[in-house]
């Protein structure tokens, strides 16, 4: 089951602005280590799921993984070989809008080296640059 909202008020959305930095969700709150975004962009539900699988596969169900983003924006596309006009295309998928500073994933209950490697594997699945961060007060 892909990550997507159960129901939305308006199915088709504008692309919106991606300018500015993140104002919330910028610190590690649940786990001990996190993956922070340095770029701005869209992360699809499939990318989030691929990251989750990569982290869980490396950690072998030890520790706990927290997903801090949710794809709540729909994006549409037109079929190929279609002329302009005739309305907006069908919903193609769902994305999470991320800005510099957002925490994407958090890991707890594992060592720093395990968390670093798991989050490195996850960052390879993303189209944005990221960095490894610690929760405030964690010894490193």
UniProtKB/Swiss-Prot annotation:
Keywords: Ribonucleoprotein, Ribosomal protein, RNA-binding, rRNA-binding, tRNA-binding. Pfam families: Ribosomal_L16. Residues 1-17 have a biased composition (Basic residues). It comes from the Bacteria. PROSITE patterns: RIBOSOMAL_L16_2. One of its GO terms (biological process) is translation. CDD domains: Ribosomal_L16_L10e (cd01433). GO terms for molecular function: rRNA binding; structural constituent of ribosome; tRNA binding. The keyword Glycoprotein does not apply. SUPFAM superfamilies: Ribosomal protein L16p/L10e. The keyword Ribosomal protein applies. One of its GO terms (cellular component) is cytosolic large ribosomal subunit. Transmembrane segments: none annotated. Residues 1-21 are annotated as: Disordered. Binds 23S rRNA and is also seen to make contacts with the A and possibly P site tRNAs. NCBIfam families: rplP_bact. Belongs to the universal ribosomal protein uL16 family. This is Large ribosomal subunit protein uL16.
């Amino acid at each position: 089951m892909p990550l997507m909202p159960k129901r939305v008020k308006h199915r088709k959305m504008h692309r919106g602005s991606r300018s500015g930095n993140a104002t919330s969700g910028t610190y590690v709150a649940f786990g001990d280590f996190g993956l922070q975004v340095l770029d701005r962009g869209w992360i699809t539900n499939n990318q989030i799921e691929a990251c989750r699988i990569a982290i869980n596969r490396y950690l072998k169900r030890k520790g706990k993984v927290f997903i801090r983003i949710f794809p709540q924006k729909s994006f549409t596309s037109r079929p190929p070989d279609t002329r302009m006009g005739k309305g907006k295309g069908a919903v193609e998928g769902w994305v999470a809008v991320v800005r510099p500073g957002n925490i994407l994933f958090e890991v707890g209950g594992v060592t720093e080296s395990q968390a670093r490697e798991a989050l490195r594997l996850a960052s390879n699945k993303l189209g944005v640059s990221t960095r490894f961060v610690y929760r405030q007060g964690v010894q490193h």
